A protein has these predicted regions:
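Short Cys/His-rich Zn2+-coordinating modules
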Residues: 61-77, 104-106
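Short flanking/linker segments adjacent to small metal-binding domains or redox-active Cys/His motifs
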Residues: 146-172
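Short metal-binding segments enriched for Cys and/or His
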Residues: 118-137
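Accessory, usually C-terminal, subdomains that scaffold auxiliary metal cofactors
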Residues: 136-146
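Charge-rich, low-complexity N-terminal segments
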Residues: 1-66
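Short cysteine-rich clusters marking metal-coordination/redox-active sites
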Residues: 89-92, 120
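Short linker/helix segments within small regulatory modules
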Residues: 104-117
Length: 172
């Protein structure tokens, strides 16, 4: 992902359709503080509000950057047992236990519709496909997956492009 400053991010936010109340709650500095040198290995980045459950997801699978408002639900409950359910992320194909699972809802304020996907609760899919997180190591063992990190990154980019097309997003 290209390196962004607070000014760049503010310009992006003005280009997309976001609820005004969310704009003032977004925490760009807190959401990007861990990226001091690593912007190039990021395909998606969540800029969260103060609660961490809403925000703007920046997506850059190739050259173009996309942004979309999201809401995260960190509990996926099995209707039969009442326990948190494990999932496989729709973006990075990482297996997540119930404590690491979430569903993400993308909302278009002007179009009055939303789309929901299963995802990693930390939205660290770029790190998961590169096997730099503990969750990625556990997932690879659990799924008995033997493909290389480069192939996982390519798969993530392909899935992100599919989701961008499903949502009808335009580059910012």
């Amino acid at each position: 992902m290209r390196t962004l400053s607070q000014v760049d991010f503010n310009a992006i936010v003005l280009q997309i359709d976001i609820k005004p109340r969310l704009i003032k709650d977004l925490k760009f500095a807190r959401s990007t503080s861990h990226l001091s040198a690593g912007w190039s290995d990021i395909e998606l980045l969540a800029i969260e509000d103060r609660t961490g459950d809403k925000g703007v997801l920046l997506i850059q699978p190739e050259d173009k950057l996309y942004a979309v408002q999201y809401e995260l639900s960190r509990r996926i409950v099995d209707s039969r047992t009442g326990r948190d359910r494990a999932i496989i992320c729709d973006f990075c194909y990482t297996w997540q236990p119930g404590s690491g699972a979430a569903s993400i809802t993308f909302t278009h304020a002007s179009k009055k519709h939303s789309v929901r996907f299963l995802c990693c609760a930390d939205l660290a899919c770029s790190g998961h496909v590169r096997t730099v997180t503990k969750a990625a190591v556990v997932s690879r063992a659990h799924l008995k997956e033997s493909i290389l990190n480069d192939e996982r990154v390519a798969r993530l980019k392909t899935r992100l492009i599919e989701k961008i097309n499903d949502l009808g997003l335009e580059a910012v």
